[in-house]
């Protein structure tokens, strides 16, 4: 009798642990979010003193436009901050927003949201797409340049500086996001 009670207790404990499988949360795990790339692209690049531009196939005209705009935006923001950018900015251009969503680079948890004209940033890499509107494209470029510049001013230009200053300097995200938004758009009734 004692032995059968012991077996029953062991079986109940094991069955209790197995029943937790019904609360599996694997579909909400953040790893493994690969995106399907529908086409193979032939990438090219331009190298400039302060930035590099990576583009593909029919994006040559867009890359030329980005080069002119980035020079203007960067010099304007450097003058405004009285600070010269030390690291090169890496611009990656996609011809459409759908093509930018095919990329695994800069894969963020809130990937289903619309970027709304703001550039995605990963380190000093700025990912932009052209939606046919030069005003939106300029806004993405200025936003990307502003974010890279602000991050370099606050955290430094070397990885060791970023780690050291990231532990010491802790600005709230709303401050940095607000500053970058202010720098990337002129004040108007729409932005207020």
Question: What function would you assign to each model-found segment?
Answer:
Residues 21-172:
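Juxtacatalytic substrate-recognition/specificity segment
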Residues 1-27:
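Bacterial Sec-dependent N-terminal signal peptides
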